[in-house]
Amino acid sequence: MSNTKITFYPVKNGDTNLIEFSDGASMLIDCKFRSEAEEDNDDYDVINDLLTNKLKTKEKGLPYLNAFVLTHPDQDHCLGFAKKSFLNKNPETAEPTKEDKDSKLILIGELWYSPRVFTEHEDDLSEDAKSFKKEAERRMKLWKNNDSTKNKPGNRIRIIGYSDVDDLKGIPDECISAAGDEICKMDGKKRTKYRFFIHSPFKNSIEGDSRNETSIVMQIRVDADGSKDAGKLFFGGDAEWRVWKKIQEKTSDKKNLEWNLFEAPHHCSYTFFSDDRDSEPEESSLNFLDNRVGNGYIVSSSKTIKKNNDNPPCQKAKNRYIQKLDDDDDYFKCTEENEKQVPVVFEIKSDGIWFDDGSKKKEQESKSSSIGKREHLYG
């Protein structure tokens, strides 16, 4: 059995994060599927890597992804979702067509949907966000109607958080998870090697007028080689500092705040630390970073971080993070360094998180190539 791997794909300011669990299941947290990379285009071809190297399981003749989580419906977190996914049809009653298969549309086993998050963004949803919501509503209807195919691959759904607008009557409690809940099931199966702790969205709004104050925030704890919770991963979309403050206030068991792999929220924006980049960081944000265990890593899913006025990414935020990494910038990774887009890959082992620098692949390429080493894409 292989170890769990986490890949942060380079999509400039945006998120496309793939987790390949040790039991063979896969989860994608957000997506930004740009146009396929061409020879004259430096954009990394995420879809090609997913379809060629990652999603090797097939269901109904389509590449199969066990779960897709949309932290919030901003376009840089769901771009290309509609074009690349098998949607709006029950795969049990409407078999994928030859065109669907030729297009290699991704069949998503289970959709993780937060009605509360969508409520805060409903005035300006993109077409991709609308497609996601429509698909979520299709799946919810199957559960409400107790359809015999509701728990089949491509029809499953997990509701994250509370809802002010969607009627959840008929959807079993086991498919609904609120802040403070731990999830040990994914895509219809009990998962014994990893678990998800939901921190946000909250039942009640928090003070502030930013749309980035509603987002799915979760901790994923992963076992490895007999070591329980060897990996402690945190994903929070674009959640700003008030969210992280409230998470700490609401969390009684401090193990649910620990991390050794943390994705810098909002593409390394300073909003994790404060509203204004010229302000001192909020004490609560610094306190959260103190929950690091072992040699933890922080990842910025963003364009190259420069000393300019961009926010995101923000050089000042990066500096704050590095200070909390014992001033060791080797533990801060960005998906684009010096304008070069490179997936950032980690592996969970019994003693924690390991950065995959691609050394094994480099060695294999060096041995197999008579004309020198090819450009290496994985770190």
Question: What is the meaning of each model-derived region?
Answer:
Residues 35-45, 121-132, 271-281, 306-313:
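Short, flexible/disordered intra-domain loops and linkers
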Residues 14-15, 36, 76-77, 120-121, ...:
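Flexible loop/turn segments at secondary-structure boundaries
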Residues 30-34, 73, 116, 201-203, ...:
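Active-site metal-binding loops of divalent metal-dependent hydrolases
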Residues 1-63, 214-239:
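Conserved beta-strand hairpin/beta-sheet module of binuclear metal-dependent hydrolase folds
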Residues 27, 38-111, 253-274, 298:
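Active-site metal-binding motif and surrounding structural segment of the metallo-beta-lactamase
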Residues 1-4, 60-67, 78-234, 239, ...:
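Flexible, acidic/histidine-containing loops and adjacent segments that form or flank the divalent-metal
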Residues 17-20, 29-30, 39-41, 79-82, ...:
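Short, solvent-exposed loop/turn and secondary-structure capping segments
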Residues 242-337:
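Long, structured stretches of catalytic cores involved in phosphate-ester chemistry, encompassing
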